[in-house]
C-alpha cells in the first residue's frame, strides 16, 4: 500500500534539517526513491494517469487494479510537493497525469468527485489496462513501438496472465541510445504511444465506477488539487478544487450540518470526524490558492462543529461520531493512520493552523488537548501515528503564516512567487484590498493605500509589515 503520510513526514524531516549543519539527506533519499519506484511500477497507470490501490508483489509491478479517490488526492499533493522540493520534472509529470485523470474521469457534473474505479471489467481483473505486443505495435508503428516497448517492458516476458501491464523497465536515456535517436525524440515517441493507447483504451469496456461522492474523500481531493495547482501553476486544478468545495457547501451542508455522502440526487448520513477535519484542512489549502471569505467562514463553521459536537471534553481528542449520532456500544476515538490519515491528527493539525491564522485560542487549546491525549500512542507506536506527529511538530515549532494584502494581480504574483518554495510549515494567503471585514487577527492585517503589504508571523509573533517583494523574499529566505 502507498503510505503518503509517511513519505510526507520524510520530506518534512529533510526540509526541517536542510538549513542546519547536518541536513537529513537520508530522509530525502528515502522519500524520493520510494516515489520514483511507485511511479515507475505497476501502481501507476502509465497510459491514463492515477494510482491503483496496492501492489500484490514485492517488486511493485502488479497492482490490485482498483483506483481510489482517497489514495489519489494525497498522492497528487505528495508528488507536487516532491517536485517543489527537488525540481525533478518526473514528479511534476506524475502529478500532472494524476490530476488529469481525476478531472477527466472522476469529477462529476455537480463538481464533486466520485469514489472509486473498480478493478475488473468484463469479469476479469485488470483487463482494461492490459496489452499485447502485437496490439501496441499495430497502434504505434515499428519505429515508435521499438522505443515504447523498450521503455515499458513489452520486449520482456508477459507479467500478468499472458498479457503485459506497463511498467517502466529502462530509463529514457538508455532507450534512446539503443534506438539510435535523440533523447527528446524518444520522449516524444513515448508520449505519442501513451496517447495512442489511451485513445484505443477508450473503446474498451471500462471498469465500473462507484459514483458516491463522499465528503471526506472529496476533501482529500480538494487538498491535493489546491496544492498541485499552486506547485504546477495550473489554474484549472484550482478551478476544479473550488467546484468541489462549492458542491460540498451547497449540496452536503444542510441546515448548518455537514452530511457524509451524495448519490443519485440525495445527500445522506450525518458526517463524521474525518469529513469535518479533512474538509477543514482542505479549505486552508484552497484558501492559499484562491482566497474566498465564504470558504473561510465555512472553515470556521467546521472548526466550531468539531469542538461542539465531536470533542472529548474530559479526555481530549475527538470522537469519530458526533454527540447527537446514534448511540454506539463503543464510541471510537481513532488516533492511528490507516488507509486515510488519522482524523484526530488532521483535526489537531488544521485547528492549530486556523487558530494561529485567526488568533483563536479555542482552536489552539483543543489541538493541544488532542496531542496530550494521543501522546502515549505516538510514543509507543510512532510510525502508526505519523499525522499526529506532524501536528505535534507544528505545535512545538509554530507554523509560519504570511498574509499579503493589496490589489489582486500584485498580491497574486507575490503569492505565486512564494509558492515556488517547498516550505511545508508555511501558509501564504493573498487577500484583496477590497475584501470585506475579516475575522479575528486577520482584521489587523490591513491593506495599505497604494501599496501591496505583507505580514509575516511565526505563531503569535509577527514581524513589521513590508511593502516590497524583495523585502518579503529576504524574510522568507531567512526562514527556510
Show where each model-derived region lies.
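Glycan-recognition and catalytic cores of secretory/periplasmic carbohydrate-active enzymes
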Residues: 1-480
Amino acid at each position: 500500500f502507498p503510505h503518503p503520510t509517511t513519505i510526507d513526514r520524510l520530506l518534512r524531516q529533510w526540509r526541517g534539517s536542510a538549513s542546519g549543519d547536518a541536513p537529513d539527506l537520508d530522509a530525502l533519499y528515502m522519500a524520493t526513491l520510494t516515489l520514483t519506484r511507485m511511479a515507475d511500477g505497476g501502481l501507476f497507470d502509465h497510459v491514463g494517469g492515477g494510482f491503483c490501490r496496492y501492489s500484490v508483489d514485492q517488486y511493485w509491478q502488479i497492482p490490485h487494479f482498483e483506483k481510489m479517490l482517497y489514495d489519489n488526492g494525497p498522492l497528487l499533493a505528495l508528488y507536487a510537493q516532491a517536485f517543489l522540493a527537488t525540481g525533478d520534472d518526473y514528479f511534476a509529470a506524475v502529478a500532472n497525469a494524476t490530476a488529469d485523470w481525476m478531472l477527466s474521469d472522476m469529477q462529476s457534473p455537480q463538481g464533486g468527485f466520485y469514489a472509486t474505479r473498480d478493478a475488473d471489467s468484463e469479469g476479469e481483473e485488470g483487463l482494461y489496462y492490459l496489452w499485447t505486443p502485437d496490439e501496441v505495435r499495430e497502434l504505434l508503428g515499428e519505429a515508435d513501438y521499438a522505443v515504447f516497448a523498450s521503455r515499458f517492458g513489452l520486449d520482456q516476458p508477459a507479467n500478468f496472465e499472458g498479457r503485459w501491464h506497463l511498467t517502466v523497465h529502462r530509463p529514457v536515456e538508455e532507450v534512446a541510445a539503443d534506438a539510435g535517436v535523440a533523447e527528446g525524440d524518444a520522449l516524444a515517441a513515448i508520449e505519442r504511444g501513451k496517447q495512442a493507447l489511451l485513445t484505443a483504451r477508450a473503446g474498451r469496456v471500462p471498469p465500473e465506477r462507484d459514483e458516491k461522492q463522499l465528503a471526506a474523500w472529496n476533501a482529500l481531493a480538494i487538498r491535493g488539487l489546491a496544492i498541485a495547482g499552486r506547485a504546477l501553476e495550473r489554474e484549472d486544478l484550482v478551478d476544479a478544487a473550488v467546484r468541489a468545495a462549492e458542491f460540498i457547501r451547497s449540496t452536503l451542508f444542510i441546515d448548518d450540518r455537514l452530511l457524509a455522502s451524495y448519490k443519485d440526487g440525495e445527500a445522506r448520513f450525518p458526517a463524521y470526524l474525518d469529513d469535518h477535519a479533512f474538509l477543514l484542512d482542505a479549505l486552508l489549502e484552497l484558501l492559499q490558492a484562491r482566497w474566498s471569505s465564504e470558504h473561510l467562514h465555512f472553515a470556521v463553521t467546521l472548526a466550531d462543529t468539531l469542538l461542539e459536537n465531536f470533542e472529548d471534553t474530559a479526555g481530549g481528542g475527538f470522537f469519530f461520531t458526533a454527540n447527537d449520532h446514534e448511540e454506539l456500544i463503543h464510541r471510537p476515538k481513532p488516533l492511528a493512520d490507516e488507509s486515510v490519515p488519522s482524523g484526530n491528527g488532521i483535526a489537531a493539525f488544521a485547528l492549530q493552523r486556523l487558530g494561529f491564522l485567526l488568533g483563536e485560542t479555542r482552536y489552539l487549546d483543543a489541538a493541544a488537548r488532542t496531542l496530550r491525549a494521543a501522546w502515549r500512542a505516538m510514543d509507543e507506536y510512532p510510525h502508526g501515528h505519523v499525522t499526529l506527529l506532524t501536528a505535534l511538530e507544528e505545535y512545538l515549532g509554530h507554523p509560519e503564516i504570511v498574509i499579503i494584502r493589496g490589489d489582486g494581480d500584485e498580491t497574486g504574483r507575490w503569492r505565486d512567487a512564494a509558492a515556488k518554495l517547498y516550505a511545508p510549515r508555511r501558509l501564504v494567503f493573498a487577500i484583496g484590498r477590497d475584501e470585506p471585514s475579516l475575522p479575528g487577527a486577520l482584521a489587523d492585517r490591513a491593506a495599505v493605500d497604494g501599496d501591496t503589504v505583507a505580514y509575516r508571523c511565526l505563531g503569535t509573533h509577527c514581524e513589521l509589515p513590508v511593502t516590497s517583494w524583495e523585502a518579503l523574499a529576504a524574510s522568507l529566505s531567512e526562514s527556510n
